[in-house]
Amino acid sequence: IMPYYGVPVGQTDEDVAMGYNKIILTDLLRDELGFTGVVCTDWGIVSSRAWGVEGLTIRERYKKSIDAGVDQYGGESDPEHIIDMVNSGELTMERIDQSVRRILLNKFELGLFEQSLVDEQAVSELVKTQDYIDAGFEAQRKSIVLLSNKGAEAPILPISTGSKIFVDGLDPEQVSGFGEVVNSPDEADFIIFYLPTIFNGNQVPGSEELIDKFLSGILPDENLAFDPSILERAQNYSQKAKLITVVDLNRPAILTELNDMSDGLIGTFGVYDSILFEMIFGHFDPQGKLPFEIPSSMAAVMAQQEDMPDDSEAPVFEFGHGLTYRQ
């Protein structure tokens, strides 16, 4: 088990991160729940993300986390502190052996000492089988969420085969089997506009400020709204043809403006372009549902309770939303 980075605020006798919290790792996880396996920390909890124990030295952080119940460290590479504590008597070999037994047991059960190398020739037979490939494609089909499907007389989706299509952000070769790909939005009957997941620093290539936010944050917590330049491009597209906007939703995004501009709005979670086009052209009926709500604004995001999954004010799309072509 890998404990969470965060602090269980107000739930134990001290507000320290899970990896330093004896009540969580020993009293709850091992004694109450009966866990006997390895506790491996998330990456860098000693050197860079020591939430709740920032005032401790590196050596003290190692000692506290081991006393809490940690067996193995992710992303740390300085065992000298632990060796020194054993030599000085601060840590007993009995405690070290306790973790060693847990770690070695996993390796024994996997047979790593008897057969440490895999049979490379068998990989394609065991892993990349047609059944697994088909199951993966089917999972992608089931994951696509049709968020909105507008139209004056009839819903815009699915698109009729043979329509003139302009694509932005997707592989035009993949759509060529469904419709006529055109080189300009002015020539198109439909524009399919794909937007990747918002990770702040990826919106304006070359922007040092945004890239710093992305890279230094690692787990981004900045604005969920799209850059104004993207909204302007979508607005321009909407004035030239019917606009189908596709947004990858590895994390929620503010879709208020895009929903207003788009004739059709689709949420994806990392699918092949070909699978997406199958859905857009009606080869299968979408059935995906949102695993979270889509908030209406950043103000609504900031006002909601961080420990509640779907309590923002007036969300654009609620948790569990998802249309089908039959609706």
What do the PLM-derived regions correspond to, one by one?
Residues 1, 42, 69, 103, ...:
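Conserved, mostly hydrophobic/aromatic
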Residues 1-3, 37-41, 72-74, 243-245:
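Hydrophobic faces of well-ordered beta-strands that scaffold small-molecule active sites
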Residues 3-21, 27-32:
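Hydrophobic, small-residue-rich alpha-helical packing segments that form membrane-like cores
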Residues 26-44:
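Catalytic PLP-binding core of fold-type I/II PLP enzymes
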Residues 93-112:
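Mid-to-C-terminal alpha-helical segments outside catalytic/metal-binding sites
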Residues 113-121:
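Flexible hinge/switch segments at interdomain interfaces of large molecular machines
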